[in-house]
């Protein structure tokens, strides 16, 4: 579509949902979300998945951190995941669209590229033959 080679094209992937997950975890665990390391993978939407097995707060497993944290709220990781997954619907109900959130996610991606930050972001890319998959964008 763009005329660019596929290795020069990327999509926003789950950058927005990952940011929402990190924000909610930080809020509920009483830490700066920049200290939370967790990802949403898959599609942006109903079938996205939170990768709990690698999620941590500054290297400490989420469950362990929650157990050590005296000021933390009672945390249900399932509820946090559901809040992230369903957040777009809540925004649409209130504002009619979600364009500000995705605009912020795209800005994050673009700034990372422009500044050569070497950031790890859950963007999507075109797959044609990798992993036995063809003609597909995944994140």
Regions found by a protein language model. Name each.
Residues 26-139:
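Long, compositionally biased stretches enriched for glycine and/or charged residues
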Residues 1-22:
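Rossmann-like NAD(P)(H) cofactor-binding subdomain of soluble oxidoreductases
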